[in-house]
């Protein structure tokens, strides 16, 4: 304190101090030790800003969380409203949304899908904590729908006799639940054929499944 009887503490002065007070007058002097306790004041940490993100289904991406504490306290991270397949390990957020993350569940989403605008937003809260202080940020991650090509299951070669009728019955489906159409090319352009004498031989027919965008 010196001789001014004043002390303006800083954030680094937390602790217990013994202060000697000396009183002196005409013909006497007196010393006394006074215990002074400076309580710690925990300062707010600094949480670096996280921007909103736009990603695609089946695309893995990461967010590196960064925060600092002016008192050099240890900083931990947590998150609220995490999607089921997302992971936060220490300060690294990792997510690879599956192809089923964005779905057509209403008239609006079906209309958006028609114009290839289908997406879904996820509001995730990230929290940085140190000692008695914490700070949070809400981040919107928008996942865009990714179309997958229709699937045609393999089928065994077809063998018929001359004058027999042929009917092709492919097993085809769309993993996104879209309607599909089938077309045929090569030896025939439809799914049926009536063979004639003289048709003996090996022929190839190409079956194509399309959802209007992918095949």
Regions flagged by a language model, labelled:
Residues 1-9, 85-112, 185-196, 206:
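Strand-loop-strand motifs at the edges of beta-sheets in extracellular beta-sandwich domains
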Residues 15-25, 105-130, 201-211:
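A short beta-strand micro-motif common to beta-rich folds, especially ectodomain repeats
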Residues 25, 67-71, 130, 172-176, ...:
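Extracellular acidic, Ser/Thr/Pro-rich low-complexity tracts
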Residues 28-39, 133-144, 214-215:
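C-terminal edge beta-strand
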Residues 42-46, 75, 86, 147-151, ...:
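Proline-centered linker/hinge motifs at extracellular inter-domain junctions
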Residues 48-52, 82-83, 153-157:
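Surface-exposed, proline-enriched loop/turn segments that connect beta strands in immunoglobulin-like
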Residues 60-67, 165-172:
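A short beta-strand segment in extracellular, disulfide-stabilized domains
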